[in-house]
């Protein structure tokens, strides 16, 4: 039976206004819209009155419910029937944890009530199209129609393909019907194999074969034999990549054989809890570094949010599934798309060339895709610290004559680093009889055929198959699985995981054969033991679906009880679905139909399928010299600062958590003005050291339209000039991931790909001492469609994205582009050696040209000398600022440095030649360094020692003030206010934020950028940062116990434990499941801290589901009430823990006036480094800190204080319960965005109880307790940041 329960309003006023504006623009006479959530409960038994009241209370969250009956025509948007939304999975979990076992499933829809004039059927279809994503959702016209969401169907049996009766044609038909993308020779192979077996194949076997042998999974082109211009080539592409490892194997521990590559890390204290006692401690051991970069291009073109989200999720799983289990740590992301064409902000180079119906626009991709990727990283608890964004779409005369080149099929790049124990780097041995396990969520009828689908050019497959290959994301589930993997690797030698792979393209049909085959075993499986939420799925759908957040593992039979215990504690679902066999055979039994859908020797599936041969021709580029008529420097500057590749990326940065883990030493945002221009991302290796890891990206794809090899060399060069900004040492410490995107089969591209791989793998990397131990290829970067009567194609340029990773010697020595105005000199190191080529530059692009000669690596020895010289100068502390030259050339490099330093520049380019345009806008490799004037001679001497004397040019100095002036021989070449340039540079991000978020907030942030008087972040402390008030208490040897409380989805517990540990506490890991099952109680604890993250993925209101699982469980409720009423206890709630505790008001004495915390005014997750002031309050944790003003990490989507009315706010203030407020950079309490990131009245962001024993706050002091993890800080701070005082105050209070 189904119950319907009304929910809160679903759209804020500005979202409704945006919808109305869209309808008006489409000439649809819609006058008014009201939208509210509607909940549907599928019940297996009736609820009594108390249970019904409990369910109603559970589903009461967010803004107050509307009291009126809605007016207008109902359009009910729900998830597509036959799918289960991530919201449903998490909300159902909460209902069960609150004791409501009668609830089979909760689901949620949005009821839109549309008031409109008379609309035709076609117009109503337009309205519904605007309101839902057809890939994920459906529209009903009656609330009762939602019954279809819970419809159950009978299982369907396996289908046989009549190969023996119909011959080869049966396979050809199945290939089309199932979208298998099989090549002719593969059809021959299958016909031969099954004829030898003497039986017909089942659909599931063909599907499994197609996924396992798709280009996506098998990399056929990279393993192919090559004939170019009639000449047999000596090596495959992959062999040339492997050549880098054969030449420079130094520091590589694992390459080419696992889900990620591993290199040597540093010996540090890894901080985690003991399995038996739950007590956190440091464990001194090597933290080796793993690295991986994936792409998820096809799904992102079809449905950007889930496409990008599952792209990030899949890459995170690759990291976790490395060796015998590892820990993902920090991420990077990248996008290449066609022109944005923002309405009202179209740029002169953006022509509309059309696109196929089934893919979304570049603007849609960049509105939704980054949000999806960020949301997954945020909820999983991984900071996203690095990225790139390129737009390109043009009709150009390239290798193949005049044609359309661009990114209708986008690049969505997801990568990152993690850490792994030395003894877990290599996979274990799978014993015969080992249990084969699926860890993670249930099978669902989604994401079918992703591997084969992404191996086709967009436009080749059927639209229904595109639907089928879109996945959905549940990062909170992946977090639970990762917690299990963490518990396993933390056991060291007792780790129950023998072998692990993630489930990706092809689902279990790819993952399980890969697992057993890699372990030298076969496997027998039971189909019906696979967890499934949809009983009507066919065997093919159960075995081959790509439900995300799953891993496959081999676990020794005798360790299964331990594994079971770990999973139950973390509430991570798992199923034993088979066991490993001696015989290399794969069998899948179906208990329901008592038959065998799969019964194959492994070598038929993964054996010697036909090897590909590429027989291709070379084409020469046809670029024309740049036509300069009509190009002025002033006009060029404004255009280039508007080009998204160059323009400010704040809209892509602040949506992503950049402080979680407490180990982020360098994020994108630089300096007191928080400008997104960092050269590279840097993390600390642990919470107790200054060793670290660095990541940087290089890519220069448009250059490939003129010179394939140069484009590839520049990508490597740019990654190197970016990562050089931190202290790494020997260049052999740097390892690269190479992600290759090409339109295979397009005239000239295959030969170009070979040329590019050869340039990097055989020549440049070996010469530099660089290794490429990991990478990925996507070989179908073309889109076809019909535009009227014309057949059109959009082909991407050959695109190599290089991600560089390295161990860092000392993270404190990372250099940023932030200029200083002390007596200084700016030096350009020009690795272009005066070539100043303008082909395929930003300048050429914004004037709709390609040019002829591009930049290149001009001298490999000098590139190596450059890296070594910068490393020497970093180690000697001779550099004040550093920024590489890239897109936009020298002018953009200097401008970004001036933005970061909030200063002026007096530059002189006389020494760069007479061609001013080329001097300012060429994109040859190089960098600008800032040094003290007194050090200039010594620095130039170091550069000369490294063979760079002829590359160094003095180009002026940074000065106070707002003028950005470039001269040559006394003549002004360009002069503008730095603030004006800063505003131009910000206009793209402003327009994107206006479109996507609350436009009022976007306007306020943009306005702030034009204020030259803004002093930036600054610090005023009322206490001595170096005084340790806990020292006398630590000296007694007594360590009070703090319960570090977490719920499923919480992700900030480790850094929180570390902060309390440093202050003299014994930090104990306490999961809510420990309390609910009675394994642990709170009676032994002196302090309790509820940590940040996304408990239950923030469904049913941030922190509210967590709170209700306490309030609705009598024993646990009493336990919390007793703790809060006990004198001599302390409690802290941070972020999600703050939201949770604010919902426990009825249990916490003196908290009656506490507010609720609701959706940010921006309607967006906000990750900021914000200034707060400590106010006079009873809070025991903030004693002695009153009046201090200091920055703190902020990361939340629901942090806005909501009070009942003005009287409630006045009472909260007059009782002195406000503990922290947001202030602007002038020190004034503020409600203005983004200084106040959530719009809370009076800047309120922390409150306390009347006794001061319980304090809750939205910002994260635990993420910045170490100075090194602050995005910016005054130079005189030592190891401890000022927020360490909170934790020491706690220790002091407990005596």
UniProtKB/Swiss-Prot annotation:
Region listing for Disordered, in residue ranges: 305-327
InterPro entries hit by this protein: Class_I_gatase-like, FGAR-AT_N, FGAR-AT_PurM_N-like, PurL_large, PurL_linker, PurM-like_C_dom, PurM-like_C_sf, PurM-like_N_sf
Reaction(s) the record says it catalyses: N(2)-formyl-N(1)-(5-phospho-beta-D-ribosyl)glycinamide + L-glutamine + ATP + H2O = 2-formamido-N(1)-(5-O-phospho-beta-D-ribosyl)acetamidine + L-glutamate + ADP + phosphate + H(+)
Compartment(s) of residence: Cytoplasm
GO biological-process terms attached to the record: 'de novo' IMP biosynthetic process
Subunit field text: Monomer.
Keywords assigned by UniProt, alphabetized: ATP-binding, Cytoplasm, Glutamine amidotransferase, Ligase, Magnesium, Metal-binding, Nucleotide-binding, Purine biosynthesis
Glutamine amidotransferase type-1 domain: residues covered: 1042-1295
Binding site for Mg(2+): 718, 722, 884
Signal peptide annotation: none
EC numbers, comma separated: 6.3.5.3
UniProt GO cellular component terms: cytoplasm
Catalytic residues identified in the record: 1135 (nucleophile), 1260, 1262
Protein known as: Phosphoribosylformylglycinamidine synthase
Family: In the N-terminal section; belongs to the FGAMS family.
Listed pathway(s): Purine metabolism; IMP biosynthesis via de novo pathway; 5-amino-1-(5-phospho-D-ribosyl)imidazole from N(2)-formyl-N(1)-(5-phospho-D-ribosyl)glycinamide: step 1/2
Domain of life: Bacteria
Organism of provenance: Shigella boydii serotype 4 (strain Sb227)
Organism lineage string: Bacteria, Pseudomonadati, Pseudomonadota, Gammaproteobacteria, Enterobacterales
């Amino acid at each position: 039976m189904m119950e319907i329960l009304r929910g809160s309003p679903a759209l804020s006023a500005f979202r409704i206004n945006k919808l109305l504006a869209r309808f008006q623009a489409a000439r649809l006479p819609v006058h008014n819209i009201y939208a509210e959530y509607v909940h549907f409960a599928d019940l297996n038994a009736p609820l009594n009155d108390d249970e019904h009241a409990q369910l109603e209370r559970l589903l009461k969250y967010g803004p107050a419910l509307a009291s009126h009956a809605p007016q207008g025509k109902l359009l009910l948007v729900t998830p597509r029937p036959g799918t289960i939304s991530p919201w449903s999975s998490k909300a159902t979990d909460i209902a069960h944890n609150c004791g409501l076992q009668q609830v089979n499933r909760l689901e949620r829809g949005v009821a839109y009530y549309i008031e409109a004039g008379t609309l035709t059927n076609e117009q109503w279809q337009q309205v519904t199209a605007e309101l839902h994503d057809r890939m994920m959702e459906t529209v009903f016209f009656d609330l009762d129609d939602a019954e279809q969401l819970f419809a159950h169907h009978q299982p369907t049996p396996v289908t046989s393909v009549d190969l023996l009766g119909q011959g080869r044609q049966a396979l050809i038909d199945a290939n089309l019907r199932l979208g298998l993308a099989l090549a002719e020779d593969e059809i021959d192979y299958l016909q031969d194999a099954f004829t030898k077996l003497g039986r017909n194949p089942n659909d599931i076997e063909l599907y499994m074969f197609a996924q396992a042998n798709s280009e996506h999974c098998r990399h056929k082109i990279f393993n192919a034999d090559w004939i170019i211009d009639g000449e047999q080539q000596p090596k495959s592409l992959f062999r040339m990549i492997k050549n880098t490892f054969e030449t420079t194997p130094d520091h590589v521990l694992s390459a080419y054989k696992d889900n990620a590559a591993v290199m040597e890390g540093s010996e540090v204290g890894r901080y985690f809890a003991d399995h038996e006692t739950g007590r956190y401690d440091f464990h001194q051991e090597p933290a080796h570094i793993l690295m991986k970069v994936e792409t998820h291009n096809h799904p992102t073109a079809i449905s950007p949010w889930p496409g990008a989200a599952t792209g990030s999720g899949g890459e995170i799983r690759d990291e976790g599934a490395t060796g015998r289990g590892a820990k993902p740590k920090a991420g990077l992301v990248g996008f290449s798309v066609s022109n944005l064409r923002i309405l009202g902000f179209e740029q002169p180079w953006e022509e509309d060339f059309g696109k196929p119906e089934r893919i979304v626009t570049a603007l849609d991709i960049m509105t939704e895709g980054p949000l999806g990727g960020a949301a997954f990283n945020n909820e999983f608890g991984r900071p996203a610290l690095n990225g790139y964004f390129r737009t390109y779409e043009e009709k150009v005369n390239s290798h193949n004559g005049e044609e359309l080149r661009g990114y209708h099929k986008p690049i969505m790049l997801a990568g990152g680093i993690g850490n792994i124990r030395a003894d877990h780097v290599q996979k274990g041995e799978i014993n015969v009889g080992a249990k084969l396990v699926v860890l993670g969520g249930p099978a669902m009828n989604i994401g079918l055929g992703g591997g084969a689908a992404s191996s086709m050019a967009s436009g080749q497959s059927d639209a229904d198959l595109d639907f089928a290959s879109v996945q959905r994301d549940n990062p909170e589930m992946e977090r639970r699985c990762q917690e299990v993997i963490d518990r396993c690797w933390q056991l060291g030698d007792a780790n129950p995981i023998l072998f692990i792979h993630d489930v990706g393209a092809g689902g279990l049909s790819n993952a399980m054969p890969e697992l057993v085959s890699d372990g030298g075993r076969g496997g027998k499986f039971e189909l019906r033991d696979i967890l499934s939420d949809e009983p009507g799925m066919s065997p093919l759908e159960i075995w081959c679906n790509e439900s995300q957040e799953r891993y496959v593992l081999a676990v020794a039979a005798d360790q299964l009880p331990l594994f079971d215990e770990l999973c139950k504690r973390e509430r991570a679902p798992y199923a034993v679905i088979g066991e490993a066999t001696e015989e290399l055979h794969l069998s899948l039994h179906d208990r329901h139909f008592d038959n065998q859908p799969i019964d194959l020797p492994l070598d038929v599936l993964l054996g010697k399928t036909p090897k590909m041969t590429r027989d291709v021709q070379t084409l020469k580029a046809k670029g024309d010299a740049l036509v300069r008529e009509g190009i002025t420097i002033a006009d060029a500057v404004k255009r280039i600062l508007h080009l998204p590749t160059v323009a400010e990326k704040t809209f892509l940065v602040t949506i992503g958590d950049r402080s979680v883990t407490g180990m982020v030493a360098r994020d994108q945002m630089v300096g007191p003005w928080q400008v997104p221009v960092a050269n590279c991302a840097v993390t600390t290796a642990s919470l107790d050291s200054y060793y670290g890891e660095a990541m940087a990206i290089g890519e220069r794809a448009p250059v490939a339209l003129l010179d394939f090899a140069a484009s590839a060399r520049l990508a490597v060069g740019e990654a190197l000039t970016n990562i050089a900004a931190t202290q790494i040492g020997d260049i052999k410490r740097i390892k690269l991931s190479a992600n290759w995107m090409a339109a295979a089969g397009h005239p000239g591209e295959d030969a170009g790909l070979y040329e590019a791989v050869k340039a990097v793998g055989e020549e440049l990397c070996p010469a530099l001492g660089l290794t490429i131990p990991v990478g990925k290829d996507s070989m179908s970067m073309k889109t076809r469609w019909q535009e009227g009567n014309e057949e059109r194609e959009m082909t991407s340029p050959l695109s190599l994205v290089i991600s560089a990773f390295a161990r860092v010697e000392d993270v404190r020595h990372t250099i940023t582009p932030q200029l200083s105005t002390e007596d200084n000199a700016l030096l350009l190191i020009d690795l272009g050696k005066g070539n100043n080529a303008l082909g395929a530059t930003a300048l050429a692009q914004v004037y709709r040209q390609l040019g002829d000669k591009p930049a290149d690596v001009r001298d490999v020895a000098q590139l190596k000398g450059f890296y070594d010289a910068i490393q020497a100068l970093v180690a000697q502390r001779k550099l004040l600022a550093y920024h590489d030259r890239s897109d936009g050339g020298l002018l953009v490099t200097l401008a970004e440095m001036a933005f970061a330093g909030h200063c002026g520049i007096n530059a002189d380019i006389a020494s760069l030649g007479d061609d001013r345009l080329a001097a300012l806008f060429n994109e040859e490799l190089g960098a600008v360094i800032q040094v003290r004037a007194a050090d200039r001679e010594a620095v130039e001497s170091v550069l000369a020692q490294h063979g760079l004397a002829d590359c160094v040019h003095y180009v002026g100095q940074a000065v106070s003030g707002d003028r950005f002036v470039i001269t040559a021989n006394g003549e002004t070449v360009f002069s503008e206010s730095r603030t004006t340039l800063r505003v131009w540079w910000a206009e793209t991000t402003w327009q994107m934020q206006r479109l996507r978020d609350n436009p009022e907030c976007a306007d306020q942030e943009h306005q702030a950028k034009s204020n030259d008087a803004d002093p930036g972040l600054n610090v005023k402390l009322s206490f001595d940062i170096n005084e340790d008030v806990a020292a006398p208490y630590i000296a007694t040897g007594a360590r009070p116990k703090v319960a570090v409380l977490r719920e499923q989805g919480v992700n900030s517990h480790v850094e929180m434990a570390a902060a309390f540990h440093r202050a003299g506490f014994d930090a104990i890991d306490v999961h809510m499941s420990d309390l609910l099952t009675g394994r642990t109680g709170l009676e032994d604890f002196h302090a309790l801290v509820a940590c940040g993250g996304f408990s239950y993925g923030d469904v049913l209101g941030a922190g509210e589901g967590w709170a209700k699982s306490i309030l609705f469980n009598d024993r646990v409720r009493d336990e919390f009430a007793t703790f809060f009423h006990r004198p001599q206890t302390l409690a802290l709630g941070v972020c999600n823990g703050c939201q949770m505790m604010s919902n426990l008001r009825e249990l916490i004495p003196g908290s009656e006036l506490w507010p609720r915390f609701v959706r940010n005014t921006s309607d967006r997750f906000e990750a900021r480094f914000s200034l707060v002031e400590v106010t006079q309050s009873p809070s025991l944790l903030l004693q002695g800190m009153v009046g201090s003003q200091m920055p703190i990490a902020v990361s939340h989507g629901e942090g806005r204080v909501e009070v009942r009315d003005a009287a409630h706010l006045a009472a909260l203030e007059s009782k002195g319960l406000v503990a922290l407020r947001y202030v602007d950079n002038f020190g004034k309490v503020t409600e203005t965005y983004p200084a106040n990131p959530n719009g809370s009245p009076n800047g309120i962001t922390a409150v306390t109880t009347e006794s001061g024993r319980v304090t809750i706050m939205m910002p994260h002091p635990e993420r910045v307790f170490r100075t090194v993890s602050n995005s910016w800080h005054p130079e005189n701070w030592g190891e401890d940041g000022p927020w360490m005082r909170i934790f020491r105050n706690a220790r002091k209070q407990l005596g």
